[in-house]
Amino acid sequence: MDALLPRSSPQLKFYLNGTPISLTSPHPRWTLLDFIRSQDGLKGTKLGCGEGGCGALSGKHVITIEGLGTVDHPHPLQERIAQLHGSQCGFCTPGIVMSLYAMIRNAYDPVTGKFQLSADDIESKGHLDGNLCRCTGYKPILNAARTFIEDDLGSVPSIVESELVGTEEETESDMGAHSGSGDTGSRSSGSCGRPGGCCKDSPGISSCSSRETDMTTPSLPDSPVLKQYDFIPYTPTTELIYPPGLAKFVPELLCYGDAEQAWVKPRSVQEALEILSQCPSATLVTGASEVQVDVRFKDFRPSVSVFVGDITEMTGISWSEDMKTLYIGGSASLSDIEAECLRCIPLLKAVNLGSESVLSAIARTLRYFAGRQIRNAACLAGNIATASPISDMNPLLLAVGATVHARTSAEETTIPMSEMFKGYRKTALPSGSLITKIAVPMPSKDQIEIVNAYKQAKRKDDDIAIVTAAFRVRIAPGPDYTVQEASLAFGGMAPTTVLAHKTASALEGKRWGDEAVLDIVLTSLGEEFNLPYSVPGGMATYRRTLTLSLFVRFWNYVNQKLGLEYDSDLIEEIHRGISTGTRDDDNPHAQRVVGQQIPHLSGLKHATGEAEYVDDMPPLHRELHGALVLSERAHAKILSVNWTPALERGAVGYVDHTSLPEEKNHWGPVVHDEPVFAKGEVHAHGQPIGLVYADDAMTAQIAAKAVIVTYEDLPAILTIDEAIEARSFFNYGKELRRGAPPEEIRKELDDCEYTLSGTTKIGGQEHFYLETNAAIAVPHTEDGSMDVWSSTQNTMETQDFLSQVTNVPRHKINARVRRMGGAFGGKESRSVPIACIVAVAAKKARRPVRIMLNRDEDMMTSGQRHPVQCRWKVGFNREGKLLVLDADTYNNAGYSVDMSAAVMDRCLTHIENCYYIPNVWLRGWVCKTNTHSNTAFRGFGAPQAMYITESIISAVAEKVGIDVDEIRRRNLYQVGQRTPFNQVLDEDWHVPLLLEQVREEADYDARKKEIERFNSEHRWRKRGIALIPTKFGISFATALHLNQASAAVRVYTDGSVLLNHGGTEMGQGLYTKMVQVAAQELRVPVDQVYTQDTSSYQTANASPTAASSGSDLNGMAIKHACDQINERLRPYREKYGEDADLGTIAKAAYRDRVNLSAAGYYKMPTIGYEWGNYSENVKPMYFYFTQRQGVACTEVELDLLTGTHTVLRADLKMDIGRSINPAIDYGQIEGAFVQGQGLFTMEESLWTRSGQLATRGPGTYKIPGFADIPQVFNSSKGIGEPPLFMGSSVLFALRDALSHARRERGVSEPLVLDSPATVERLRLAVGDDLVHRAQVQRKDGEQGFFVAVA
């Protein structure tokens, strides 16, 4: 490389939002994200997972969210996302906006001046499969995107017209929240004001072509429902996409770096080979999507990185003259390959069906390869060279006989794919070689050659494979359909991608279509892939089943092509349709402001990237960055900690348990049993040992990884079963009982006509808020006070423990939070130690200290929803009437109590759900294990409890042979009956009515009959439906002291209002709702009321924003304050008239020395339950159940061959009384449903045997995406935690589908379906012959690779 250095340049030149950038020797470890966020005013681009990479930017134009628009001058897309309620917490919104922007701009045809965009393009082409949102349920985002569909491609779908709702009254001036609307004429003329530049600032430059076209999208099609939305028209030709300076850009050989790492960007293959000849171990990158994961999670540090993504010789895609070979450049993007295949399929279909088969297989495989952003950057050569055993593309390349062309400085070699893989992550590529192209042969047009490829993952879109397969078969012409040649390739079945040689040989020479031949193949595959129970990656039986199932799918596919008998269910995978749905927007209680569908007050800030989260705050003078040192053992003694290597790598200092007194080193929301810093012993993988701090975040991370900790391992308990066996419990000891006393409950069971016993398990759930835990501690050396910004739901607890660890009185600690990028309970307590740790560091360093956890750090340290196991016995009669329930319920607390006891409280009090059982004895156990400490999560133990009940109901229905809906109906609570904790269900108990309403409105009975018909006609596709009720108690249950709130309202003499309260904004729209309350009470527009942030200085002793009580508590406190002010202003309203504005009234009152500020306070009345008090006079535990009851009706379709499913329709109905803001409440119910859908079907947390969390990033832990939401999504109002359990209706609908399948196959054993109902569990529960063939027996002492801790 020395010879190249004199010819190289260290300058990286590109454009950023229209501005030329020239960087000299940038940091070689920087990603594009690192650079963008280091620039002033460019914080809209967020760190979501840290698993992507940037490649190189030389000669590119980078557009960020700030380059599209601002709050004052938003891009039409940004405005529509905000106005149509497409954001809640807003952290994901900039990324989603940019993905939509790319889709919309690419859909623009400069020749016709039209947007070639349809609903199918938006939902089915993968444009959004790399984006995740945890809050909204995706529906409003899709609605906003659909407003760009033009009339000539079909009008905006009816879903938009039915959901972009409102009344003309909402556009009046007192609805100031509609700040995005305005005079569209003035806003679309002249410069658009975009920071990235506008073409009207530079006349004559067109963004798409030299042809000037003034094309704008209509605001929306004419519709009386939509006329209130005066959206900004979209004029794409006003956007500067290609800066003129790029036309003059001359590529240079780029080389920069430091003593540890160099980054090189050659211009040609020859330059790349010269580099490799001198540095044969250099790391080649194009998208860096694989390398960056190793850098982030495996501490991989390439000494030389060579970017080959812009070498023209390697990015092309071409055909041989005879069209018999497709040549794919090694660096050609996967998106380009997909596009080329789609372009050629119709051209070749008429002349060469074999070629069409190959190209279709490639295109289909690439469609579900990662996400769109990855496909735009990643290349095929990288896929081959990394040699992943679960590669999507390698089995297909192997099956079709592709060859790899590789060059070194000395020679060019051609390697057949069949000889490429030599071992796990090892290839036959020569040292220092470069893959220049891949040759994909096409079948001869006179041959009958059929190819297809398959992939099975936990989720359809953007997921790594469990098993991949590709099959090719050549059939001899003639009526016998003799197999001349076969190739069967699999990924996920061995350390490398492999060919099933034995099976292929057994197939060759046989007659295709003969069922006996199919049996031979299946037997041979079972022998060839005989996985052990302990196979790395786990799922041994499921993976073996898939090898058989996927071949059966191919067998039927070939039969169809040959005109033989086939089953269509076995050919096509489940494909979802375009999503639709309705909302019931009748709101008879709407007032002038309260009850109106006002957009989230920060919606435009979210959509433009201007919303500021903790880590977006500008850097402070002399600020330091922290990085945690975490335990790498589940349970061990700490023998020594050597901090010296960290200091040598650039750390300024560190803190650990020696940095604060022993008595200050323990915290906990209830019991102070958790060390802030581990001392002497660690009790979980990921437990904080210390923190190093440095001048920048990257140095801090490197230094933290350099710390050497020596351990002595101790036995670890991971699962609930292990905790029960070891009697490892925290002190809890609570129970609930009704009817027969405990000593007689067993006799009552024996006296029942029927009894059943069982064990029900439900796994945990990662919060997966998009903004990880973050905090900034700012010490004030003058007086010892401290400001701490934290992403927390709980300013009071944060303040309390900050005071403890810094030894500073609470009145000198100001805990502050402006907004969170999601929380869901996960930042009620687990944010506290993060703030405490940086505060200790800030006090020691006497400088501000900042931290934002990486995704894996956050997942390892922050805890999850509690895994729960219930061991139950139930007694009932032949009519299915429940009589007795005797149950032990266990939750996995982790290594500290945190809020696990309170979670168990709610679990026990919701375990009967909506059903009256006269005799119950319920006991709770809180298990102590060596996993991270589990914590609050939306629902707080109730979803797990209600799932147990519904599982019991299903088991009872199966036992007595009565329809499960009838069993539910017969056991429903009636008005006047009492819960096991003696709370009366009064006249507001509406669940029986809601069930009947949903049954009628969802056309349930007719659909159930149609499902019976469908299932009778489809052996390998089954549909199911479920109608699930729920109730949820509102209040902080037995933490009575938390059921209070205070607020401060200050009126200024111009009529503006400052509002402070203790509630925190995490995306649930609390700030918006509270502003509405104040605006309603003080009779002002919402834009006259301002809430800056939540601060312990402004609102002392604030209860956490949790338990679905934020609006109830804080809203009433605000009303109390406003009532006081209104009473003081009453004489002035009488004097000046009811129509007088608040400014006039306030000014007059001020001159009369009237106090224009008030402190409000509210405590929730009537509650105060005492555990163990079974008298009928005991105070209620919950303030109410009414207005938070709900019913969900969900229909699914299940592919029995793979376990994949789709949600065909969901109808949700909740009684929430008088909604403050229906639009926000809709977002809550739909988002909660999708989150619940994830809990019960997809989100599976797994640990390694050593106690390390295996699912600690989006690559291994999957939450629902855009393609997972119900295809028809109908909802009525809801809010907060209660709607989450409605997501269980998906699982019970799947259970219904499985029941049909099992009855058809004669499976008589009771169906046990633990949660989550993953593709693995669903497939294996079918109980068919393929599963029996593939069954892997567990040998004595053999353990599974992963551990599920429920």
From Swiss-Prot:
EC id: 1.-.-.-
Disordered: region residues: 164-193
Pfam families the record matches: Ald_Xan_dh_C, CO_deh_flav_C, FAD_binding_5, Fer2_2, MoCoBD_1, MoCoBD_2
Cofactor: [2Fe-2S] cluster; FAD; Mo-molybdopterin
Residues binding FAD: 284-291, 379-383, 392, 455
Enzyme superclass (EC): oxidoreductase
Binding site for [2Fe-2S] cluster 2: 89, 92, 133, 135
Stretches with biased composition (Low complexity): 180-192
Gene Ontology MF term list: 2 iron, 2 sulfur cluster binding; FAD binding; iron ion binding; oxidoreductase activity
Occurrences of domain FAD-binding PCMH-type (ranges): 256-445
Keywords: 2Fe-2S, FAD, Flavoprotein, Iron, Iron-sulfur, Metal-binding, Molybdenum, Oxidoreductase
Binding site for substrate: 828, 906
Induction of synthesis: Expression is induced by nicotinate and 6-OH nicotinate, subject to nitrogen metabolite repression mediated by the GATA factor areA, and strictly regulated by the cluster-specific transcription regulator hnxR.
Activity regulation text: Allopurinol inhibits catalytic activity in a linear fashion.
InterPro entries membership: 2Fe-2S-bd (IPR002888), 2Fe-2S-bd_dom_sf (IPR036884), 2Fe-2S_ferredoxin-like_sf (IPR036010), Ald_Oxase/Xan_DH_a/b (IPR000674), Ald_Oxase/Xan_DH_a/b_sf (IPR036856), Ald_Oxase/xanthine_DH-like (IPR016208), AldOxase/xan_DH_MoCoBD1 (IPR008274), AldOxase/xan_DH_MoCoBD2 (IPR046867)
Binding site residues for Mo-molybdopterin: 793, 824, 938, 1107
pH dependence remark: Optimum pH is 9.4.
Entry-linked PROSITE patterns: FAD_PCMH
Cofactor notes: Binds 2 [2Fe-2S] clusters. Binds 1 Mo-molybdopterin (Mo-MPT) cofactor per subunit.
Top-rank taxon, per record: Eukaryota
UniProt: [2Fe-2S] cluster 1 binding residues: 49, 54
Residues annotated as the enzyme's active site: 1281
UniProt record similarity statement: Belongs to the xanthine dehydrogenase family.
Record function comment: Nicotinate hydroxylase, part of the hnx cluster involved in the purine degradation. The nicotinate hydroxylase hnxS accepts nicotinate as a substrate and catalyzes the first step of nicotinate catabolism. HnxS also accepts hypoxanthine, but not xanthine, as a substrate. The major facilitator-type transporters hxnP and hxnZ are probably involved in the uptake of nicotinate-derived metabolites, and the oxidoreductases hxnT and hxnY in the further metabolism of 6-OH nicotinic acid.
Protein name as annotated: Nicotinate hydroxylase hnxS
Gene name, Swiss-Prot/TrEMBL: hxnS
